[in-house]
Structure formats: C-alpha cells, structure tokens
Amino acid sequence: MSGSKRFAVCRISAASLAVATATASLYAQDTRTVKEPVVPPACIILKSTLTTAGAISGEMETRASKAGSGQASLDTARIQQALDHCDKGHAVELDIEGSNDAFLTGPIFLRPGVTLVVDKGVTLYGARNAEYYAVKPGSCGIVSDDSGNGCKPLITVKSATGSGIMGDGAIDGQGGAKLIVDGKVSSKTWWDLAEDARDAGKLRDDAPRQQVPRMIDTDLTDDFTLYRITLKNSPNLHVAFHRGDGLTVWGITIDTPKTARNTDGIDPAQSSNITITRSWIRDGDDNIAIKAGDGPTTNMTVSHNHFYWGHGMSIGSETTGGVSGIRIQDLSLDGPDNGLRIKSNATRGGLVEDVIYDDICIRDSKIPILFDSDYSFPGKGVNQLPVYSGIELRNVRVSGGGKIQFNGFDHSHRVGVTLDGVLALDSPAHYKAQANHSDLTFGPGPVNLVFIGDDSTVNGKQVNGKLPGCAAKFVPFP
C-alpha cells in the first residue's frame, strides 16, 4: 500500500481491559433463557402420496400447467388447510407412507402457535412453476428493475408468533432445477436468474434484480423456532427473520452449493433476542448476515456452530438502524470465502458496537477477517456513515493464509477493535494484515500479526503466545 507504515505502540493496563471485557460479557446477547426446543404434539399427520422421483421430475407441474389446473395436484392445499385448522401449541406433521417420501408445494403460510414438522426421511419440495409464487401476474421467475419482491416466499411466517418448523426431514427449494414455464421445462433455474441479474448489472449503474422466492420469510413474528430441520437449495435466502423478538435456531442444517448466488443461510434484521446454536451451514452467500436497515438488531447469541463454504459470519451490509449486543462464540469456519466480516458503506451505514467474537477457528479462507466500512460503495450519497466500535476478537485462531483487514471510512468514522488472543497458527508471514482509519488494542491475550496501514493506532504489544488448537473444531459436514 502506498504510504503504508508500521504503527507506533503504546501500552494500556491489562487490568483495566479485563474489567471492561468482563463487564461487557455480563450484558447484551440474547436476554432469554434458551433451552432445547421440544416438538409439540401433532394435531394431524399428513401422509405422503409422492416419491422423491415423482416430486422432482417436473411431470406433475407440467401437466398441471398445460391443463390450467393450478396447484390442484400438488400438496399445497391440504398442507395449508391443516395449518389453518390446527390449534395453537400443536403441529402439522408430514410423514412417510410406504415408499412415498415427498411432498410438493407452492407457497404456504404458517399460523400463530402452529408448528410444521417434517419427519425423518421426508422432503418437502418447493414447486418449480414461477406462476405459483407470483405476487402479480408475470412478476416472478424473471429479471427486472423491481426491488426483488416479485415472488411470494415458499413459507411465509407473518404475524405468526409462537410458530415454528421442526423435524429430522428436509425442505428443498429446488433452486438448481429447471423452471416450469407455460407447461414446459425451461432452460433456466432460479439460480440462473441470479447470474443473469449480475451479468446485466455489469452493463449499467442500476443493476436489475432476479425475482425469485425466499425459502422461509418471517415478519412481525415473535418466538419463532427452527429445530433440527435441514434446508436445501433455496432459490434465494434460506431464512429471513424481520421485525421480531425471539428467534431460536437449534441443530439445523443448511446445505446449498457455493455457486448459488444470494442464498444466505440466516438473515436476522431489525430484531432482538436471537439464538442460533449447534447448527451446520454451507451456502452460496453469507452463512449468517445480521442486518439493521430499518431499525436496530440487538441481543443475539451465535454459539457452537460450524460453517463451511459461504461468505462467513457477517454483519451488514445494512447497518443504518444500528447493531449491538452480539455474542459469537465457539464457531468454526472451514473453507469460507470470508470468515468474520462486518460490511457497510456510506449509503447504508450506522453504528455497530458491543460485538464480541470468542473461541473462533478459521482455516483456508481468502479473507479470514474483514471489517470494512466501504463495502461495494457505489459512490452515491454519503449521509449514512458507518462506525464500528467496541468490537472484540478473543481467542481467534486462523490458518491457511489470507487477508486480515480493518478499514474505517475516514478519520472521523473509524473501526475500533480489541484483539485479545488473535493468532496465525501457521506463520504470520502468510497473512496480509492491514488497518486504515482504525484503532486497535492488543491484549491481554497474544497477537502475532503485524499490521500496516494509514491513520491507525495500536495500543498494546505484539507478542507470540499459545492458544488452544483447532483440530477438534473442524468436523466433517454431516
């Protein structure tokens, strides 16, 4: 970097830092007492009438499209009817019947207090006919200049407090399967539309958007639970939790190819009291992305999780409403493009503070750590400037090389981060560590990285040391 330099070092009191750290740990994070969920009793058990081969062949949907019969031959109506008539505190259960192990559905809607349970060995498939999801005729399954809301989600959870999705089965959005258009199998998949939108965006300033459905979209719903379910191949985001208080995600699996664009795993936004724990996530975008575009996101615990391919544990890019009180602990990131990431820019920035990462292992990532306040900045409008302060990295171990960067927006809008035990387990020489418009504090744990950059300070001392190894953290994807 032109003009890059090593920072001057000044010391701070380790005791003072320890007190501040302990105080921060007592507050924030999910304020609820979160326990392992319990599957509620069934109000009705629906038996499968389809094999997996029949559900994914597309034949049922092409016949229905040609006949103009809509979703009559799908499972949409009977699942929805069961959800509508189930008492609160109970579940609609999807079960195997002989060799039949699949359900095929268009958009469905959860109801307050009602849980959808997908039994072991059962897969609930999302239909491939874009007409079923269209908000208005022709609005879904295309690339257009609209905002990206042309499709209903596969599962809508709106004003449905106390609802959930559970079970040892799977929900498959068929994002990589060819769409059904006018009674024929088309040449495009949901994921192809995302690529088409990106290609079109390279030719113009205002990029068009793919109009594709999310898998699970919640809004104005408190105390929502995802438990043990496997989510696969969403056309877009797998789980969006918006304007809610109380989200529990426990023991789920998200499994989607790394090439599937915009397939975030879990995106909490404008919400509070969130726990995501004991889960395995790999997808084509952020494994988790904490957002705060229209309001604050606060009090969140991410614990005992394993991430694989994807764009890592992210905050942003929408941070206008403020993000605070976040605790991320016992996390392994094995081969992601990015590891730990805070991203925003001057069109959508805000204050990100009181975020603690603890006991983190990252290997084989191009960018193990990136806190960037100029992320994908389009160069228009500078009235929502991002500031990151009170960020702590504790017991973070990286291996495999890559970039570690802290980039504040300017001299007045900085990144403030404490590195309390941050080690390259191989060699610091394998990493390009940079800090610009940033204030770094080292200690009391060891830090063996050497940072260069501009307009930045370091309080503390770079020292070699030891932290627990990561071998046991990296487990195969289930």
Each language-model region and where it sits:
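Short glycine/acidic-rich loop motifs that flank beta-strands on beta-rich extracellular proteins
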Residues: H90, T105, A127-N129, Q174-K178, ...
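Extracellular "leader-to-stem" segments immediately downstream of a signal peptide or signal-anchor
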Residues: S2-T115, D119-Y227, W250-K258, T418-D420, ...
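Active-site-proximal loop/turn and secondary-structure-junction residues that shape catalytic pockets
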Residues: G98, R243-D245, T253, A292-D294, ...
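Right-handed parallel beta-helix
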Residues: K120-G121, T161-A170, D222-K232, D245-P257, ...
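Short, T/G/N/S-enriched strand-turn elements that build extracellular solenoid repeat scaffolds
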Residues: I79-H85, A102-P112, L237-R243, T277-S279, ...
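Flexible loop/turn segments at secondary-structure boundaries
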Residues: L26, D101-T105, R111, G284, ...
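Extracellular beta-rich repeat passengers
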Residues: G339-P478
